């Protein structure tokens, strides 16, 4: 049986307030801080900052 994974599923939410989000996973041992990256938001058709939130 596989052990508990170090990777955790997360949701990256757009800071533009459009409600658009991406889902991904990250290694919580290597990156304990919250991710923040620039990605394309198709609603506003621009690259904006996406911040990590918990995936429910």
From Swiss-Prot:
The molecular function GO annotations come to: structural constituent of ribosome
Query: Which InterPro entries does the record associate with it?
Result: Ribosomal_bL33, Ribosomal_bL33_CS, Ribosomal_bL33_sf, Ribosomal_zn-bd
Q: Which Pfam families match?
A: Ribosomal_L33
Keyword Repressor assigned to the entry: answer is no
**How is this protein annotated for GO cellular component?**
cytosolic large ribosomal subunit
Report keywords, A-Z: Ribonucleoprotein, Ribosomal protein
Keyword Ribonucleoprotein listed: yes
UniProt record, GO biological process: translation
Disulphide-bonded residues: none
Similarity comment:
Belongs to the bacterial ribosomal protein bL33 family.
Protein known as: Large ribosomal subunit protein bL33
Its source organism is Halorhodospira halophila (strain DSM 244 / SL1)
Lineage of producing organism: Bacteria, Pseudomonadati, Pseudomonadota, Gammaproteobacteria, Chromatiales
